[in-house]
Amino acid sequence: MASEIHMLQPMCLIENTEAHLVINQEALRILSAINQPVVVVAIVGLYRTGKSYLMNKLAGKRTGFSLGSTVQSHTKGIWMWCVPHPKKAGQTLVLLDTEGLEDVEKGDNQNDCWIFALAVLLSSTFVYNSMGTINQQAMDQLHYVTELTDLIKSKSSPDQSGIDDSANFVGFFPTFVWALRDFSLELEVNGKLVTPDEYLEHSLTLKKGADKKTKSFNEPRLCIRKFFPKRKCFIFDRPALRKQLCKLETLGEEELCSEFVEQVAEFTSYIFSYSAVKTLSGGIIVNGPRLKSLVQTYVGAISSGSLPCMESAVLTLAQIENSAAVQKAITHYEEQMNQKIQMPTETLQELLDLHRLIEREAIEIFLKNSFKDVDQKFQTELGNLLISKRDAFIKKNSDVSSAHCSDLIEDIFGPLEEEVKQGTFSKPGGYFLFLQMRQELEKKYNQAPGKGLEAEAVLKKYFESKEDIVETLLKTDQSLTEAAKEIEVERIKAETAEAANRELAEKQEKFELMMQQKEESYQEHVRQLTEKMKEEQKKLIEEQDNIIALKLREQEKFLREGYENESKKLLREIENMKRRQSPGKCTIL
């Protein structure tokens, strides 16, 4: 079963200290232990706007994330709380609470942009928390969204078609949820009652004009619409009287404003029901170890003065996991071969048949646990390792057979050697008596079971080592004429030549078997990889179709509002995405 994590309280994940971002290693160890898919909800907003209260509600606790209800704001950096998902079994809810933006007490707000960017990069649902209505001041305070193009890269190299890199953000970015706190106005637009979502969409309407003021008005709205096509809005009444706000976490629901309680329940219900599992491009599901890798890669890039690159982060993660997938597959191969093979096998084919079955399983394991294997680098490595392991088993099989046959020969032919030493055959007629006894022992050897595929080779080598004894017995047998001896010599030569031919034929047969196995192995790699690539291509097309649909919806909206330039830009992005929807090549081994 996948592991469940029960953190009793939040822990700092990324500390913002002295203008540096430092990862908490203990938090990484916790992420490493979460094998379940993670739903990552991050909240960002100005300092002392009640972000932590909402996050505690999502954790199902009154206390946990520090509320900072005094004049001094509490949360510094990014804090993490991992809890079992309350509605979706087998998933872990990872809550990320961030330090308040633009805190005057910090004096140095240079890391605010990075905190904002990291919250976007790591989350599957991004909650922006602000006070009051969505007016120009609220938009100005959300200037961080306009800076994302300067803080984040989606691709490691520029797009050849000239499309702006930020056009790819949609495929990586989370759902955007705007939480409006202490909202006291009626939800009206042009005298008509509207929903919070309709209010948000109205607030994101652009103004026409090319002057600096209009551009400043439009820029944050444009970025939200382009980068976050999936948007949601919630409004919250003031939770209690002002004098009670300082002890909000101690108040029971009956002491809070009933509308606020209902609004919080609606918010948490939405998050629990609709916040998606964090995924990467290609539908790669993020679990704890993968989230850990993303944290390390992104913070590492920021610390080194680079921009966090989403494509590079995925490829870094792929390098780690693909290497582990190779090892996992090889371990399975070795374990299964050791368990199932009975050495020595009687034929090479028997061993190769077993190898083929377990090799297929090993390839399945690798492909199941790997992704984004560029140019099939890791699958090629797996193929080479499987060949090496196979050859090691073939050698071991031969060694076991040779050792067993040598012991058997010593047992069977040992008494004959003793009789030779004692001179039993050093008499007239002794040569043929020796041959007769040796043939009987050879028959006994051949009938012995479980010798393996080296049986004939070991016997041949043994006979070759005794050729001088046979030659001596033949020469000294006084009962044989010279002519008879010549005939016997020729017979021995013919037997030797026949044995050599058999050995040559066996080598050729082994070569052909190995070539056949090599081709079968290649075809198995190609078959399984092709199936995986088809499945990945299907997922990628579905993913891109969803992105295209979101972009089309926004493009049509721009067109209806009369913003033809923005509509044309999105249309170019959509056409470029459609052109890129081509299947990958299968080039392995």
UniProtKB/Swiss-Prot annotation:
Query: Can you locate the S-geranylgeranyl cysteine lipid attachment residues?
Result: 586
Q: Its domain of life? A: Eukaryota
Q: Which GO terms describe its biological process?
A: activation of innate immune response; adhesion of symbiont to host; cellular response to interferon-beta; cellular response to interleukin-1; cellular response to lipopolysaccharide; cellular response to tumor necrosis factor; cellular response to type II interferon; cytolysis in another organism
The EC number of this protein is 3.6.5.-
SUPFAM superfamilies in the record: Interferon-induced guanylate-binding protein 1 (GBP1), C-terminal domain (SSF48340), P-loop containing nucleoside triphosphate hydrolases (SSF52540)
Q: How is it modified after translation?
A: Isoprenylation is required for proper subcellular location.
Catalysed reaction, written as an equation: GTP + H2O = GDP + phosphate + H(+)
Residues forming the propeptide are: 587-589
Domain annotation GB1/RHD3-type G: ranges? 35-276
Membrane topology, from the record: Lipid-anchor
- Where in this protein does the record put region GTPase domain (Globular)? 1-309
Molecular function terms, GO-annotated: endopeptidase inhibitor activity; GTP binding; GTPase activity; identical protein binding; molecular function inhibitor activity; protein homodimerization activity
- Any one Gene Ontology cellular component term annotated for this protein: Golgi apparatus
Q: Where does GTP bind?
A: 45-52, 181-182, 245
The record's top EC class is hydrolase
Chief site of localization: membrane
Q: What induces it?
A: By IFNG.
Location of this chain's protein in the cell: Cytoplasmic vesicle membrane; Golgi apparatus membrane; Cytoplasm; Cytoplasm, Perinuclear region
- How is expression of this protein distributed across tissues? Widely expressed.
Task: Indicate where the modification Cysteine methyl ester is found in the sequence.
Answer: 586
Kindly name one Pfam family recorded for this protein.
GBP
The entry assigns this protein to a family as follows: Belongs to the TRAFAC class dynamin-like GTPase superfamily. GB1/RHD3 GTPase family. GB1 subfamily.
Summary of subunit composition and partner proteins? Homodimer; homodimerization occurs upon GTP-binding and is required for the association with membranous structures. Heterodimer with other family members, including GBP1, GBP3, GBP4 and GBP5.
Q: Which PANTHER family match?
A: GUANYLATE BINDING PROTEIN
Give the protein's recorded name.
Guanylate-binding protein 2
Q: Which gene encodes it?
A: Gbp2
